[in-house]
Regions:
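Cationic-aromatic interfacial patches
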Residues: 21-88
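Generic hydrophobic, helix-prone segments enriched in Leu/Val/Ile
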Residues: 2, 35-38, 42, 114, ...
Length: 165
């Protein structure tokens, strides 16, 4: 009987873990507080500084570490603001900027945006559903309305410049 009760408890606990959009989120309390504090701090900046610049500056001095999203045997949303690589830096700065533009101020809102940015179609299925490379990131996120492609169109821009050396 004790064994059956334990199994039921574990099953109910797992429902709670996956209840929020069926996503397990791996984060520290320090990282969740940092998100909320950054979303609060941005309210005091002037309108002259672009949001991505403001948030990017907040990560100066954060160590560059690779493979910070590879935790455990299954894919989950990882929030790690105390170690970044090139892609996670851009993802975090972008997610924070989008939160401000949408008037979001909670860690939960931030996680929803981060999940949409980081995964094909905004859905976590497995390791292969993560946008591992910037070209992939640039293909999927315009469809979500998060970024806009800026290009020269069909013709390449060319100009002649004379240098005096």
């Amino acid at each position: 009987m004790k064994f059956v009760c334990s199994l039921i408890f574990i099953w109910l606990s797992s429902l709670t873990i996956f209840a929020n959009d069926k996503v397990l989120i791996d984060y520290s309390v320090a990282d969740s507080l940092k998100v909320v504090n950054l979303l609060e701090a941005v309210k005091s900046i002037g309108s002259d500084e672009p949001l991505p610049v403001f948030f990017g500056k907040q990560f100066l001095g954060v160590p560059y570490v690779s493979s910070t999203l590879e935790i455990g045997d299954y894919e989950r949303l990882v929030v790690n603001l105390h170690q970044l690589d090139c892609t996670t830096f851009v993802e975090n700065v972008t997610a924070l900027s989008i939160c401000v533009r949408k008037n979001y101020s909670s860690f939960s809102d931030y996680c929803k945006i981060l999940k949409k940015l980081r995964y094909w179609g905004g859905e976590i299925k497995n390791y292969t559903s993560r946008l591992h490379y910037f070209p992939w990131w640039g293909l999927d996120n315009p469809k979500k309305g998060f970024i806009t492609e800026v290009s020269c169109g069909d013709s390449m821009f060319s100009a002649t410049q004379v240098l005096s050396v």
